[in-house]
Amino acid sequence: MFQYEALHVGCNRIPTAATWSSNLGLIYGAERLIAVADPFKEINYLMAGHSGRINCVCELATNSEYRSPFILSGASDKTLRLWQLEEEYFTCIKTIELEATVNCLCVNENLVVCGCSNSSCIVYSWNAEQRNLTEISRFTCSEIIPLEFAIVKLDHGIILTVCGSSKKIMVYGSDSAISSFKLKAVLRGHLDWVRTLSFKKTSGSTATLASGSQDRYIRLWNISLWGSEDEKVSEEFFESVLSNKPVRFTLGKIDLKIVFDALLMGHEDWVMSVDWHPTKEMILSSSADSSMIVWEPDTNTGIWVVTGRMGEMASSHGSTTATGSAGGFWGGLWNPNGNCVVCWGRTGGWRLWKQDAGQWLQLPSISGHTKSVKGVAWDPEGKFYLSAGTDQTTRLFARFKKDNAWHEMARPQIHGYDLTSISCMPSRIGFLSCADEKVSRVFKFPKTIVRLLYRLCDTNIGEESLPDAANVPLLGLSNKATTASETGTVNAEEVQTPVADVIGSLNHPPFEEHLQRLLLFPEVEKLFGHGYEVYACAISNNGNIAATSCKSQTPEHAVIRLYETQSWNQQQVLKGHSLTVTTIKFSPDDRYILSAGRDRLVCLHEQAENLLDYNNFASIKAHSRIIWDASWAPKEMGYFFATASRDKFVKFWKINDNKKICDVAALQFSDAVTAVDFAPFFHNDELLLAVGTEAGKIFIWRCPRENLTKWYPTRLPDHMAPMESINQILWKPTFETMGLYSLLIAGEDTSVRLLNVTLG
């Protein structure tokens, strides 16, 4: 009945937000969701349950008989959740309530350690057969808030290191997995907060700890047995090389020492993560300087050297954490085989490299929004879709013909305001978007992206009169078009800008750096007139008129402004509302403009004789609470539409032959209804209506076209549904097989979902 064809979410900006599992692939936190993905292709699962941001995830061991994967997650909602893959989806089988935000998790075989923002560290024993976490002990890191752990089991006991809001690294020890941890030593040397730790066990009694800090350096510490020769070294010698002084501690009945071994310098900003290679003596580090480095010891000298560097040069991104930047890479991971690395950054997108013949080759990966998605729009032919979110980006997704998966093919708009709505032009050459500003903006496809979509996705969009590419001027805020005339080239076919060179050579979905810089749409027009932030927008089905509304608390500003799309001049101002107009919809033949708003009114304006002007037709108080959305039925139904409201009703209305609005039927729900959309086609002579609620529930309602009072629902299963508000829901305008349709969903949970709906 239901199956997701595509899922898009970005990764949280936290170094502990992701892990790479040998069984499941990438596991990462996406705001309040947990995503499980194949980084080479697509997201396979999304799990909802936490009420706060996911800060850490890890995979737990399974027993030999029952190999169903387990995932443990911690979040700012002060809970740990245990998830198990049952049949075809993950289920939360246990929730542990804690006293503070969960910052980090660490797993070693059946031992799990959890760190919280109140400085408490809790140790659990994991039993896969009983599917249970049992608390063994807890202790408090009195001097720091833990941000990351590293744990190693040696022959004589267990060593747990803790880093966080301090220059120090705290070393705890336990004689066995069932005894409590005691503070054994404190490692000093870093000059700023230590952000990350990672252990490499080298023998039964030795290990190497890697630590990364905001001081931009990585330090290596060797743990080994305390020998008799250590007693003979004088204190005077230690004073002369203080940083190399061994730190002695007892684990069980054995004395061990920790010695600073090496200082790795290569990053130009905070070191966010360090990760040992699964089998080799190699370290992967990621940094806020937008680079990842692979370190290896030289075979002759033993000195650690850089053998691979991925990402960007520091000079190319300019700002650093010292200037308030939140850019760069937030974490890096090896895959379980050790031949691939991934990292994620501010935009939520993943970057992936694979080692081939000693060279690191970049491959396309997955991406998505990092904040709530407010609007989506379909290409009229269903070949691609657009999304707009409060992460201040609009994104274009299309199906890559080689792997048949939906990838982000362009990032048309990278804005300075949260996006609130988006509408695609019927001509397919561009779109209209609005944000938390008084201006709406019109964008058109550049030729580089038109050709990219044709080459990779078999999507044919006419490119006549389109600009070649787009860029953002150094001191500008708008995407500026670049054309042949501006380059001094007479023949437009001969124009080869750097953007055209790079994008024209792509035979795969673009990388994250392409999306951030080279795949912008040129902004061709700004639409002025509103006195407050623009809230909703729409374009008529014939493409001749654009309509916008803004936030308002007075009738003066609660208007719809119409713009003629040839010149983009304001054509008319439609009145009728007294508060914010939340949705604007043109009837299939553009004869009526339907609007609804916070004032609980539904207003209709009818087309005048000149076809560009509209006259006030009717205004009715349709609901008892704010009306969030409305939708027209297919044109064969006449003028039949639905409205959705916070009062938990969807109501159906029809303009009869006497030009009166009649109340036809109503559907009641258990939650506020936030999104509705009629399919623009019939299924076996039935109307199809998709409904989304504030609680994330999604319904498909069917109704015989001869009897508009009989509606039959089908509900999306809870494990597939978002857990937060549905901001917009849209049927794909086309289908290939009768009974197999697609539904596009914009969620407050940061996700864009493409759902396949199979009807009998």
Swiss-Prot record:
GO annotation (BP), single: tRNA wobble uridine modification
Keywords recorded for this protein, A-Z: Cytoplasm, Nucleus, Protein transport, Repeat, Transport, tRNA processing, WD repeat
Pfam families membership: WD40 (PF00400)
Domain commentary: Folds into a two seven-bladed beta-propeller structure which is required for elongator complex assembly.
WD repeats by residue range: 49-93, 97-134, 139-182, 189-231, 266-305, 324-363, 368-407, 414-453, 576-615, 622-663, 668-711, 721-760
Similarity annotation: Belongs to the WD repeat ELP2 family.
Assembly: Component of the elongator complex.
Known role: Component of the elongator complex which is required for multiple tRNA modifications, including mcm5U (5-methoxycarbonylmethyl uridine), mcm5s2U (5-methoxycarbonylmethyl-2-thiouridine), and ncm5U (5-carbamoylmethyl uridine). The elongator complex catalyzes formation of carboxymethyluridine in the wobble base at position 34 in tRNAs.
The keyword Membrane is assigned to this record: no
Location (main, coarse): cytoplasm
Disulfide bonds: none
Protein name: Elongator complex protein 2
Cellular compartment(s): Cytoplasm; Nucleus
